[in-house]
Amino acid sequence: MSQIPQAVRERADTLHQQLDDANYQYYVEDDPRITDAEYDALLRELQSLEAEHPELKTPDSPTQRVGAAPAERFEEVTHAVPMLSLDNAFDDAELAAFVKRVADKLECDGDTLAFCCEPKLDGLAVALVYENGRLVQGATRGDGRTGEDVTLNLRTIRSIPLKLRGDSIPPLIEVRGEVYMRHSGFEALNDRARENGDKVFANPRNAAAGSLRQLDSSIAAARPLEFCAYQVARLEGEDDAHSHSDYLKRLRTLGFRTSPLLDVVKGERGVIDFCHRLGEQRNGLDYDIDGAVIKVDSLRDQRELGFVSRAPRWAIAYKYPAQEQTTTLNDVVFQVGRVGTLTPVAKLEPVQVAGVTVANATLHNMDEIERLGVRIGDTVIVRRAGDVIPQIVGVVESQRPATTRAIEMPEHCPVCGSQTERLEGEVAARCSGGLFCPAQRKEALKHFASRRALDIDGLGEKLIDLLVEREWVKTPADLFRLEAERLAELPRLAEKSANNLVNALEAAKRTTLARFIYAIGIREVGEATAASLARHFGSLQALSEASLEALEAVEDVGPVVARHIHTFFRQPHNQETLEDLQGVGVTWEEVEIAGRPQPLAGQTWVLTGTLESMTRDDGKARLQALGAKVSGSVSKKTAGVVAGEAAGSKLEKAQNLGVEVIDEREFLQRLAHWESASSEDAQPTAPEDTP
């Protein structure tokens, strides 16, 4: 084991503490003091140090929230203290009866009794066990006595501390709480699913539960799960708490989030007022609650009251009325998302749901329509929860009229008229219009101008948004028609910046075929595939005229991608867009393909660290031009690794696997040799004499 320099060890400890503090400030205090970008920079620095010095990596490091190797199954966990359910109250009278029962049992005045009240989050209950301050086990509620060990998944949730904070750390503590998903995170998760053609979740609770039960914890790590603590079930060591609210205060000092809405109230009036007040706040929350939990605050009184069968006498759950109504589905229209995904939107007979008039609801995709069995004209059940878009959750088939009609996916985009496509295995249909489709215009232009595409310096996302909104730019070619005088009229874009942007646009006209193919945004055509297409066909015309069979013969191109490419070039408006770009002066050198050998064909190379003589992208392009595939990871099949300055874990892995490693000097020498040999062998033959 190599000796770690003291300065490195101290820096790692500092980063560890800074990241822990940032998590505490964000999730517990709700007072973030650094930006997301600053947090990410600290995390990347710690990851880099741990990659160079694996001994620094600890189970409670903030870097260990990315997930571990997939498990084969979840082990059963027997709860040391059963996770019991609560009795329910559905109105003020039942709340009053609960307070009276408690007061009678304790033989006291109900008006003087203190109750701790908090929202009942609609998620998944879990139990977390900490030994000497470190998380050792996390389990689901299960049937209340036996749950499942989901420790690896729970470790990925940033609002769950891997190591407890403070000086008074108990030898053992079991903390219970709810894993849930905010509406904002849920909508973003479903947006990504729609873009990728995956199934969407019906509601945040299902999303949270499904994420927590993934055998592959890296999936849970990518989901926006959160945790809120509500109970101390076991505690060993110093315990000076006299009330439930005392325990919740201690949980905050240990690093847990508790509900910011909890309150300690007195008597029947206080309990009823809290439930009414929370009910008024309910629709403005960024997460689902299905009620309130009312607990006798005194721990001594809790012990005296005890339990009846499956529930404690000292607590009750107040349930709010369901946020559902029935109405008529009048029609279905299809909206086009920023990457072309078609989403069916239900047009409803307006109905009041949870105090809000609902006239539209999402149907997600055609699979969901088929699952529901819904038809236009049906009486449907509509649910609304907080800020989540209202959705249809069922059909009242007993009220179905004879005049209903089926919902059909349009064959052409309702925005631009392009052909729609739905590939086998995908649940979403998409518009194939790409750059031509106004609904996709902003994102298509941002991709076109991005660093790995045409790399237009100074053309940021906000500026593109503004140019599209003012209708100054409708196609990529319009970018190259912009004039400095007009650009200078825009807010925060002075004359000098406007001139710089026009110069950058002029420079971007000179590109490569591979970059251009990538820039035009053919679905699923990334950098590597674009480079393969450029090498294989040599010109845009040859690529645009290629058959499906010819496309499938290209390295990295399978039947699905071939179909995307083929469809793109068969759309007349896409051809017009390409001709327009060439008309404003976008050019590239055509790639020589006839007779040009590729000395690195079939080889995979990896670039790591910083190169002084060129950028990594330039090095990658030169390797690809010689036939190599350039990968971002090292394996036994890697032919060689080019190691620049500050090469990290890829260098170490290559050395461990016995993969050849060369420095930049050797790389330049080999490039010169390979490119010279390729050029000499590729000399064109002299034309035959003509009579």
UniProtKB/Swiss-Prot annotation:
Protein name stated in the entry: DNA ligase
EC number: 6.5.1.2
A Gene Ontology cellular-component term: cytosol
Enzyme class, spelled out: ligase
InterPro entries in the record: BRCT_dom, BRCT_dom_sf, DisA/LigA_HHH, DNA_ligase, DNA_ligase_AS, DNAligase_adenylation, DNAligase_N, Hlx-hairpin-Hlx_DNA-bd_motif
Family from the record: Belongs to the NAD-dependent DNA ligase family. LigA subfamily.
Cofactors demanded by this protein: Mg(2+); Mn(2+)
Span of domain BRCT: 595-684
UniProt keyword Ligase present: yes
GO molecular function per UniProt: DNA binding; DNA ligase (NAD+) activity; metal ion binding
Keyword terms, alphabetized: DNA damage, DNA repair, DNA replication, Ligase, Magnesium, Manganese, Metal-binding, NAD, Zinc
UniProt-annotated binding residues for Zn(2+): C413, C416, C431, C437
One Gene Ontology biological process: DNA replication
Disulfide bond sites: none
Organism of origin: Chromohalobacter salexigens (strain ATCC BAA-138 / DSM 3043 / CIP 106854 / NCIMB 13768 / 1H11)
SUPFAM superfamilies with a match to the protein in the record: BRCT domain, DNA ligase/mRNA capping enzyme, catalytic domain, Nucleic acid-binding proteins, RuvA domain 2-like
